[in-house]
Swiss-Prot record:
This is Chromosomal replication initiator protein DnaA. SUPFAM superfamilies: P-loop containing nucleoside triphosphate hydrolases, TrpR-like. Keywords: ATP-binding, Cytoplasm, DNA replication, DNA-binding, Lipid-binding, Nucleotide-binding. The gene is dnaA. The keyword Nucleotide-binding applies. It is found in: Cytoplasm. NCBIfam families: DnaA. Domain I is involved in oligomerization and binding regulators, domain II is flexibile and of varying length in different bacteria, domain III forms the AAA+ region, while domain IV binds dsDNA. One of its GO terms (molecular function) is ATP binding. ATP binds at residues 170, 172-174. Residues 343-462 are annotated as: Domain IV, binds dsDNA.
Amino acid sequence: MAVSLWQQCIGRLQDELSAQQFSMWIRPLQAEMDGDTLVLYAPNRFVLDWVRDKYINIINQFFTEQMGSDAPKLRFDIGSRPSAKKPSVPAPIAPTRVANTQTKATVGTTFNVQAEPMANANHRSNINPSYQFDNFVEGKSNQLGKAAALQVAENPGGAYNPLFLYGGTGLGKTHLLHAVGNGIIKNNPNAKVVYMHSERFVQDMVKALQNNAIEEFKRYYRSVDALFIDDIQFFANKDRSQEEFFHTFNALLEGNHQIILTSDRYPKEIDGVEDRLKSRFGWGLTVAIEPPELETRVAILMRKAQESGINLPDEVAFFIAKRLRSNVRELEGALNRVIANANFTGRPITIDFVREALRDLLALQEKLVTIDNIQKTVAEYYKIKMADMLSKRRSRSVARPRQVAMALSKELTNQSLPEIGDAFGGRDHTTVLHACRKIAQLREESHDIKEDYANLIRTLSS
């Protein structure tokens, strides 16, 4: 009875959570009765803690609504339910067997058409050891991406395969790829982990064709334990490369070997890539990495300054973070310039000093992002008239874009709420605040709004 109740609860959670949240946290759970207690089994400690912290109240409330005082007690455990014949999550990848001529430190490399790279005992991993989960600054914009990456590192080839991360340039996708690779290697030094840009895969295939070594190419890429490919959108219109990757993809998944892909856009929006590939990209878990919000931008600056041995005043970090919003790479580049100028001149890092050091960059940002620019961009995106943005019309087709534009104005400009309200037809600041809160809520609940907002930020920040 209680297990059946859990199935009903799953239906409720699927309605209330986003597809990403449901796939990451609820789908991996298994349920079984133990006396008067319903035990929920999570695949690992990370999932267990997250579900217990975030969703236990929703679950208990549903049980009480359905069964009142007869509702079962709830307990969490790690693993699979004892009666399960098979685990719901595939077993972790087995380490690749290596020949006696190879070192145990074999991890990954790029393809070499002259000889199979695995025959070289001295080749090194191309996973960057400096990219770790510990130095990845987490915020709302990348929380799901980091959580998924952590689980893949702990259980490669398991729950989320393939993992597809998408978002604009400089948001931390590559950092997460390397962090996963480092996590896999830490747990299994014999694992063969390969990271590369999609253009390198294409180059390797072309060289293999030129050197009559296509079989070696296939053997190498289909033998890895984990394959991470950055910027998969560069496969567009490269038919032979897509054909080879299609078969490589299938071979790796059949062997429960982990695949992680990144792109600057949602899989179905990648032009020039075969539908059968785009379909496979969505077989596992697809997660958006969005531009960092203000608090995360500040945290990134403070972490970077700390790593550089620089004391960055809080007010300076906020000043920079409020004005540079597009991506992490831009933030770090700006801070590097400030630090270099401070070291060269010997002057303390103050807001006035930062204004001077980043004069051209700040001027460009202020010129690019204005409320008027946001209104025009949003009106064009949603195909409404600019006049509607300022009107009193309340139909959803107009009100929702107006709310999106208000939220973007708060995030991307330095204008106050009253100033934003004035720019939207003399509206009160409480209307702007309500719009910002409503859009923040919808970005959690609606995939379409989340995508629209991310697309608009990319457009306005480019």
